[in-house]
From Swiss-Prot:
This is Large ribosomal subunit protein uL3. One of the primary rRNA binding proteins, it binds directly near the 3'-end of the 23S rRNA, where it nucleates assembly of the 50S subunit. One of its GO terms (biological process) is translation. InterPro entries: Ribosomal_uL3, Ribosomal_uL3_bac/org-type, Ribosomal_uL3_CS, Transl_B-barrel_sf. Keywords: Methylation, Ribonucleoprotein, Ribosomal protein, RNA-binding, rRNA-binding.
Length: 209
């Protein structure tokens, strides 16, 4: 089953029948319009390309405009691709809505995490801070040792150190689907999803469900 592209609206909470508070993220999923259908014969694999939302005409390049016209759809804010399996049939211009998740219990959500800039080891990797006093005057938030001795005589690749944190593709798996509101084009999932408010997210049925 394919996924859908949505927009993170924000977090809130709802109450179940027992009065228990459930923290949920609201994802707005407008109709995903099929802009291209890829097949094994023409492209070497099966997939569909979709767009969603809208884009100012002045912001659409000529190649993009031609691509959208050929598909017979309104220009969207981006293009995304989903692999399809045997038996899944889609046509150019077809609209796919949030109700495809009506019977789905859990989903995987992919987004771009919030960028935090250059961060130290404590914030980036949850390293423990060193002593505040007891003779420590300079190394409160320093990593500590980053190597061994003359052998190997280098710092191993992948060593957890200070550096750029966030602003990368992140997937949160197996989030519970709390509610599907097809009328308002909303999907409510339990817990947090990556990224800032209004960020694009990709929602797919959970691979580990």
């Amino acid at each position: 089953m394919i996924g859908l592209v949505g927009r993170k609206v924000g977090m809130t909470r709802i109450f179940n029948e027992d009065g228990v508070s459930i923290p949920v993220t609201v994802i707005e999923i407008e109709a995903n319009r099929v802009t291209q259908v890829k097949t094994v014969e023409t492209d070497g694999y099966s997939a569909i390309q979709v767009t969603t939302g809208s884009k100012k005409a002045s912001r659409v390049t000529k190649p993009e405009a031609g691509h959208f016209v050929k598909a017979g759809v309104e220009a969207g804010r981006g293009l995304w691709e989903f692999r399809t399996t045997e038996g899944e049939e889609f046509t150019l211009g077809q609209e796919i809505n949030v109700d495809i998740f009506a019977d789905v219990k859990k989903v995987d959500v992919t987004g771009t995490s919030k960028g935090k800039g250059f961060a130290g080891g404590v914030k980036r990797w949850n390293f423990r801070t060193q002593d505040a006093t007891h003779g420590n005057s300079l190394s409160h938030r320093v990593l500590g040792s980053i190597g061994q001795n003359q052998t190997p005589g280098r710092v191993f690749k992948g060593k957890k150190m200070a550096g750029h944190l966030g602003n990368e593709r992140v997937t949160v798996q197996s989030l519970e689907v709390v509610r599907v509101d097809a009328e308002r084009k909303l999907l409510l999932v339990k817990g947090a999803v990556p990224g800032a408010t209004n960020g694009d997210v990709i929602v797919k049925p959970a691979v580990k469900a």
